[in-house]
Amino acid sequence: MEEPGATPQPYLGLVLEELRRVVAALPESMRPDENPYGFPSELVVCAAVIGFFVVLLFLWRSFRSVRSRLYVGREQKLGATLSGLIEEKCKLLEKFSLIQKEYEGYEVESSLEDASFEKAAAEEARSLEATCEKLNRSNSELEDEILCLEKDLKEEKSKHSQQDELMADISKSIQSLEDESKSLKSQIAEAKIICKTFKMSEERRAIAIKDALNENSQLQTSHKQLFQQEAEVWKGQVSELNKQKITFEDSKVHAEQVLNDKENHIKTLTGHLPMMKDQAAVLEEDTTDDDNLELEVNSQWENGANLDDPLKGALKKLIHAAKLNVSLKSLEGERNHIIIQLSEVDKTKEELTEHIKNLQTQQASLQSENIYFESENQKLQQKLKIMTEFYQENEMKLYRKLTVEENYRIEEEEKLSRVEEKISRATEGLETYRKLAKDLEEELERTVHFYQKQVISYEKRGHDNWLAARTAERNLSDLRKENAHNKQKLTETELKFELLEKDPNALDVSNTAFGREHSPCSPSPLGRPSSETRAFPSPQTLLEDPLRLSPVLPGGGGRGPSSPGNPLDHQITNERGEPSYDRLIDPHRAPSDTGSLSSPVEQDRRMMFPPPGQSYPDSTLPPQREDRFYSNSERLSGPAEPRSFKMTSLDKMDRSMPSEMESSRNDAKDDLGNLNVPDSSLPAENEATGPGFIPPPLAPVRGPLFPVDTRGPFMRRGPPFPPPPPGTMFGASRGYFPPRDFPGPPHAPFAMRNIYPPRGLPPYLHPRPGFYPNPTF
């Protein structure tokens, strides 16, 4: 409907351009007046063309509207006629259907009257045949039942003799079920204890992560403030340089103007010099023509007053010209000096722009690093949330399973009592009871196998969770080291800022000399900086423990230079090209990442302990997981150095705890100086144990499970993570459990339900992490 109105619009511009060309091509006499009635000619022509097209559009729209109204009237008329025809058709169809129904009813009545007689006779014959067949079947069934009853009587006589044997078997199975229920109860108590330890470790980990996040936020804010201050200083310097440049340019323009004026003056003087020479020649000719010397002298004295004035003026002009030449030379020297100064200013400006660009690139890189660290923090928080939800779900499942098992035990006890009563009352129900006993035995076997499989799977899960917790702690240590690295960068930028404030021209100093001579984190004579010279001292976290002397070195520190397990450490050099033995001798220096060339998986394999039946070999302690930052650098880690000095990671605690426990058990094992032996035996033992090897627990200790560490800033029990699960599945080796301090027979290896009340648990429960039974009923 709107196409005719839309077609002229794209062509309006072309029409107007053609009209303008036609008007421009007309001669001046034929052209219309420029301002008819006060309006320009182009506007009048455009208005006329637009009015013409508007009239056309209006006519077209009116024609379409009238036509559409005519179509509507015709459609209404045709609709009325169609509705009338449809009504007539419906009436005719109804009449036809009524007539057809009447005809069909008449035919059915006639056919029924003929067939009713035949059907009655056939039905009577069929009923008689059916009764005969039923009687024959009943006779055969009665004979079969008689035979079955005779067989049942024989079987019941034989089953009476087996009744006593079944009773004895049932009593034995009940006792085995009671033993299994006892063992399950003990395992459930152990699982509860392990869940509590996992909760404690999660809380500590959450607190450590919060501290790391706070440090990150503080570092980011301080970093932003430093960048803002440095940017403001550079802006002020650039504005001052721009002002100096403007003043130099103004002075340059003024000097050029002075030079132009003096050049013009010199040109005028050079123009006057030939005229002065001509006047001097005329005067000499006049003096030679005179004959008398007296007259000549008199004339000279008389005319002296008239001639002295032009000669003196010429001499003055010559002297002034010489002075102007000297001043011009001096001005040219000043001009060259000003040009040299301007070139130096341009060079300094270019250097400043390059330095600003470098700072901007550094700022972009630091922002990208901050974004990466924020993403890692978010990932760690998500992992923590997932772990907490997982442990909560496991706790709920355990409670539900315990209630279900108690209800199931009560129901089974009731069933067993009913079975005994029924056996005593009626001997005919022995067959049903035997079937029930068989079903119960099958179910019990299934549950036993199921629980065994679940115990295996949950122990594996516990080991995996332990490994995940250890990796999380290592990630925390890496984050702290990264924070320390950022603090070191902040201190360096602060020192640069102070030097720039003192002497802004000191930009040619190399970064190496600057970091080594002026940084407070440079190596001191004692190997570490003092706490007063640092800008950002590291706060003491919850995982920081008091200093412990390692059995490897007499001066402390977990890595000695004499350990043969790392032969490459003696050949590594730092940034200055000096050997790295100084770094190894210093016990308070942060370790570097250049020591190990093995993957983390191999390092985790080296951390494997021997099985519970064997003793620890006299080899070196498992190698530490080396740091990720400050590779090949002799410079200390700045604010993070005290943390490496104070904190003991989980790997060190894992190594130190067995040695402390063994020393508390046996006073004869005090000498630990012979532990520096190559760890070549560890890979062989790991290969012998196989891929499904689970690390054994710590050495047995009397009293509480974890010793209380009162030397740290906070009272806590033992390491932040529980010990690894035992290597055995349904009962550990004898070397693992402590000596029994209570009388009575030993417990069964795997007990089940018991109809008697529960007994007291032993005072010491061996840890079995990851045990979450999941029975199926």
UniProtKB/Swiss-Prot annotation:
UniProt feature, compositional bias: Polar residues: 530-541
Record InterPro entries: cTAGE_MIA/OTOR
Transmembrane spans: 39-59
Family to which this protein belongs: Belongs to the cTAGE family.
UniProt lineage: Eukaryota, Metazoa, Chordata, Craniata, Vertebrata
Any one GO cellular component localisation term in the record: endoplasmic reticulum membrane
Chief localisation class: membrane
Any coiled-coil regions, as ranges: 118-269, 339-498
Keywords: Coiled coil, Membrane, Transmembrane, Transmembrane helix
Location in the cell: Membrane
Region of interest: Disordered: 510-673, 721-742
Gene giving rise to this polypeptide: CTAGE8
Topology versus the membrane: Single-pass membrane protein
An individual GO BP term: endoplasmic reticulum to Golgi vesicle-mediated transport
KW Repressor (keyword) present: no
Bias kind Basic and acidic residues: ranges: 572-591, 649-672
Organism (species): Homo sapiens
Protein known as: cTAGE family member 8
